[in-house]
């Protein structure tokens, strides 16, 4: 018997191939996506309606509902419920037809674009939600650029078609001209505002006429007719029917052709139209998404691209969250499964520290709700209790050592000293700042003078600072004071302290340390930055922090 025949007949080989088949079947059923949008475009509403159609919830709760009504499933933090906005990412898993869908709900505010980027690092697809009356808005543009950095497929859903809005052709042109992204309308709206009658499905050449459900709480009823059915003339006003026919001819004549490869490369966005509040077009979007979306694929690592059916388990931490359950003051690490099969009670290696961990209470995440998880496959997101071991970007694995590409920090634009005016609250203050730093709620920096111990909060936007203060008071019982600093630009120094010492004294900049003890130069404005770059061309300054590996952060 040859070596190949012997190996193929061995129990070990059969066990591995059986496991790989199991993983491959699970991957075929997995889809995941993150939703990005400008505030008030209806992101939380769309999220809830997708859960409604997936059977994960029985009744949708509006964010701005009265207190007697249900709160939104994806908005679990008290401040989110008060303000009606998402300020932290959430994972929601549900089943639809034969697929398991992992939905990552991202913050709806550009001040939290770094949290959005971390979430997109775990996502295989993105859904860009737009208000049909407004089109592209500033924060959508910024979040789109974050998507582009990840080179993932982007699906576009134009929402609020039941309200007066802009011309659909004009909205498509805006995406193509301003984002440099080609568009393909998968369905097309019939009317808008109070004359919105439904959509035409170009895939199946069918007209879907919708009836409103009561406040959009239940699944919408759907009358489906074939294109050319004589009944259409009785159900749709003549001018709307003629307009639909004219616009469809225009799309077929000069519109971009459907190209699945271009979609997967992030060069072509499939476009959908509907109204999440009244459930118009939501299920059509979901069904097309399952057909077009990227399934979990290979991930780049320190030992090469790792295919999802590699039999050893591996994954990376893309988010940390403290106090999801205020009763237990817990800390959860969100992990994206990349390869193999995850099983409860398995023992894994923690790449950054080299330590061995037993994962005894893994959790399936659904907003604030959790249940114990027995297994998970590539593309799934799992929750692990975090006793202070994990940092964002950490890799866990079994088998041979590997590390996935880390998740970088971006240049903050607002800086302030964080003061604790009450010495008796030092312990909860330190604990709160440390845990909020771990989860990436804000970046923490320190004076280069070791005698000064006050933390410097560094954020993309003002709302981040407000959230940190709110959470310190609400979750840790600590009132704090902010002392604004006059900086607006931060740059990391390539080569670290050694390079900085060789350069000597620098003017019009202040040197601080980041969480990992690396030098960061703070500038009052871009002009001061350009001046330093001109005076010291030997300095390599980076707007994105190098990824920390094998290091421990400075203690608060």
Swiss-Prot record:
SUPFAM superfamilies: EF-G C-terminal domain-like, P-loop containing nucleoside triphosphate hydrolases, Translation proteins
A single cellular component GO annotation: cytosol
The tr-type G domain, residue ranges: 28-297
One annotated GO biological process: regulation of translational termination
Subcellular location field: Cytoplasm
This protein's record includes keyword Cytoplasm: yes
Residues that bind GTP: 37-44, 105-109, 159-162
Superkingdom, natural source: Bacteria
A GO molecular-function descriptor: translation release factor activity, codon specific
Keywords, ordered alphabetically: Cytoplasm, GTP-binding, Nucleotide-binding, Protein biosynthesis
Keyword presence, ATP-binding: no
Family: Belongs to the TRAFAC class translation factor GTPase superfamily. Classic translation factor GTPase family. PrfC subfamily.
Its biological purpose: Increases the formation of ribosomal termination complexes and stimulates activities of RF-1 and RF-2. It binds guanine nucleotides and has strong preference for UGA stop codons. It may interact directly with the ribosome. The stimulation of RF-1 and RF-2 is significantly reduced by GTP and GDP, but not by GMP.
HAMAP family associated with the record: Rel_fac_3
Identification of the protein by name: Peptide chain release factor 3
């Amino acid at each position: 018997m040859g070596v190949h025949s012997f190996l193929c007949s061995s129990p070990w080989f059969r066990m591995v191939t059986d496991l790989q088949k199991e993983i491959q079947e699970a991957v075929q059923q997995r889809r995941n996506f993150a939703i990005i949008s400008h505030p008030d475009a209806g992101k939380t509403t769309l999220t809830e309606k997708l859960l409604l159609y997936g059977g994960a919830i029985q009744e949708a709760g509006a964010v701005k509902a009265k207190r007697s009504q249900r709160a939104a499933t994806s908005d679990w933090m008290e401040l989110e419920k008060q303000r009606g906005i998402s300020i932290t990412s959430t994972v929601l898993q549900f089943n639809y037809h034969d697929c398991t869908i992992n939905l990552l709900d991202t913050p709806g505010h550009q001040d939290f674009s770094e949290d959005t980027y971390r979430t997109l690092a775990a996502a295989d697809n993105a859904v860009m939600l737009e208000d049909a009356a407004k089109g592209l808005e500033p924060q959508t543009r910024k979040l789109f650029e974050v998507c582009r950095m990840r080179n993932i497929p982007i699906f576009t859903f134009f929402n609020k078609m039941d309200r007066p809005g802009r011309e659909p052709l004009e909205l498509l042109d805006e995406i193509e001209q301003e984002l440099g992204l080609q568009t393909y309308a998968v369905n097309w709206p019939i009317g808008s505002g109070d004359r919105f009658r439904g959509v035409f499905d170009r895939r199946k050449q069918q007209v879907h006429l919708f009836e409103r459900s009561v406040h959009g709480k239940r699944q919408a009823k759907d009358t489906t007719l074939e294109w050319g059915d004589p009944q259409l003339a009785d159900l749709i006003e003549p001018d709307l029917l003629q307009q639909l026919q004219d616009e469809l001819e225009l799309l077929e004549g000069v519109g971009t052709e459907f190209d699945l490869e271009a979609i997967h490369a992030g060069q072509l966005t499939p476009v959908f139209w509907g109204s999440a509040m009244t459930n118009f077009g939501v299920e059509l979007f979901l069904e097309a998404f399952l057909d077009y979306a990227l399934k979990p694929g290979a991930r780049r690592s320190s030992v090469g691209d790792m295919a999802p059916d590699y039999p050893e388990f591996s994954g990376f931490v893309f988010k940390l969250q403290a106090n999801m359950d205020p009763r237990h003051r817990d800390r959860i690490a969100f992990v994206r499964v990349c390869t193999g099969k995850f099983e409860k009670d398995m023992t894994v290696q923690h790449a950054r520290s080299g330590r061995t961990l037993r994962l005894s209470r893994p959790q399936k995440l659904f907003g604030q709700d959790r249940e114990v998880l027995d297994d998970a496959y590539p593309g799934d997101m799992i929750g692990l209790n975090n006793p202070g071991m994990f940092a964002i970007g950490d890799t866990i694995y079994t088998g041979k050592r590997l590390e996935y590409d880390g998740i970088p920090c971006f240049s903050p634009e607002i800086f302030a000293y964080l003061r604790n005016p009450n010495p008796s609250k030092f312990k909860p203050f330190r604990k709160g700042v440390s845990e909020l730093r771990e989860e990436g709620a804000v970046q923490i920096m320190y004076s280069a003078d070791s005698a000064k111990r006050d933390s410097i909060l560094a954020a993309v936007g003002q709302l981040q600072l407000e959230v940190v203060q709110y959470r310190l008071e609400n979750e840790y019982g600590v009132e704090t004071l902010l002392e604004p600093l006059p900086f607006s630009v931060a740059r990391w120094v390539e080569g670290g302290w050694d390079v900085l010492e060789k350069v000597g004294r620098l003017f019009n900049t202040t040197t601080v340390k980041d969480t990992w003890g690396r030098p960061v130069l703070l500038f009052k404005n871009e002009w001061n930055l350009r001046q330093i770059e001109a005076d010291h061309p030997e300095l390599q300054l980076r707007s994105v922090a190098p990824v920390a590996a094998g290091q421990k952060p400075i203690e608060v």
